[in-house]
């Protein structure tokens, strides 16, 4: 039985990835920080078959200890401070977790595996997946973006992701490690945290439909993103580690939608006119805005056989329906 270790298992992607690996009869271990973390309790309820190990990405010895306990065949590093506005508010911590955290995981794998100058592991090779991000492209010079598109990040989060991405390449080339990065474009789900734009919109539409709120305040509606379903995207992670050779891949739908289109679809689901409820508030606009990101997933389609199954409209409907059910359950409790 294959054994996988997931950092960031309390996240949207972590839970979907764990479910996917369990369906393939993996043994799954989650690396979590803080025994009193309420998100850990949620993981225990959602994923009772997942074993949890405690540690801290800010401490190399802690990461190494977890790797020694779990002895994984595959390690998926999904941990990050991924909310862009939060990365501005806590830029140093973002660098420590999202950037240097990758270094500590790679070093833990290298030390545990006994990889040195010979580039040959003495204890078996751990295959490593790094969750890179389309935010690394930032102020794009070409569209759509491929694996060769230059990086020009415009946020602390994007900059930290570039550091982790390049480190993964460095360890692959310098030590012969099976280390890959998936450059993931925006992917959402009902499990997305409410502070993220997509969930803010779907939750807002649901609250307005149920009479909980009257207005939804948002920033620029013209910004465009390549949005997909998180449950689809985690399949690509496992496929990357199943290849004969380690390579990086862009993962996305190849189709962009504006924030206005997202809003329109969410309010269509609840049969309301968004123009009557949405207010554009300049205070929500980022210090430096990323205008348009669009994936070219040709390589992933060709080499991994990966394609998204859930379309944009279906995704937004899924999220709104989930939020309506959640709010209705809360009101009846």
Which residues fall in each region the model found?
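N-terminal Rossmann-like NAD(P)+-binding domain of SDR-like oxidoreductases, especially those catalyzing
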Residues: 1-187, 310, 322-325, 332
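C-terminal substrate-binding subdomain of Rossmann-fold SDR/epimerase-dehydratase oxidoreductases
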Residues: 23, 30-31, 55-58, 192-193, ...
């Amino acid at each position: 039985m294959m054994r996988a270790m997931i950092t960031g298992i309390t996240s949207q992607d972590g839970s979907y990835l764990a479910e996917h690996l369990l369906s393939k009869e993996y043994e799954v271990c989650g690396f979590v920080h803080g025994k009193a973390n309420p998100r850990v309790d949620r993981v225990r309820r959602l994923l009772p078959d997942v074993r949890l190990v405690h540690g801290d990405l800010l401490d190399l010895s802690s990461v190494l200890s977890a790797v020694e306990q779990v002895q994984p065949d595959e390690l998926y590093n999904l941990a990050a401070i991924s909310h862009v506005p939060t990365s501005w508010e806590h830029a140093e911590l973002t660098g420590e977790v999202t950037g240097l955290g990758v270094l500590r995981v790679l070093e833990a794998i290298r030390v545990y595996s006994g990889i040195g100058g010979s580039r040959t592991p003495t204890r078996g090779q751990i295959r490593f997946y790094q969750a890179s991000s389309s935010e690394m492209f930032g102020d794009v010079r070409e569209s759509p973006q491929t694996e060769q598109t230059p990086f020009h990040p415009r946020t602390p989060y994007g900059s930290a992701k570039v550091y982790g991405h390049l480190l993964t390449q460095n360890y692959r080339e310098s030590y012969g490690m099976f280390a890959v990065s998936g450059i993931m474009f925006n992917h959402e789900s009902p499990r997305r945290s409410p502070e993220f734009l997509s969930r803010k919109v779907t939750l807002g539409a649901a609250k307005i439909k149920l009479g909980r709120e009257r207005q939804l305040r948002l920033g620029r509606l013209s910004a465009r993103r390549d949005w997909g379903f998180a449950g689809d995207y985690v399949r690509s992670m496992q496929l990357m580690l199943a290849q004969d050779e380690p390579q990086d891949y862009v993962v996305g739908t190849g189709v962009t939608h504006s924030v206005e289109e997202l809003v329109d679809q969410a309010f269509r689901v609840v049969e309301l006119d968004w123009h009557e409820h949405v207010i554009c508030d300049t205070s929500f606009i980022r210090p430096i805005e990323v205008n348009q990101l669009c994936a070219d997933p040709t390589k992933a389609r060709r080499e991994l056989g990966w394609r998204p199954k859930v379309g944009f409209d279906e995704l937004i409907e899924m999220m709104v329906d989930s939020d309506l059910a959640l709010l209705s359950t809360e009101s009846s409790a």
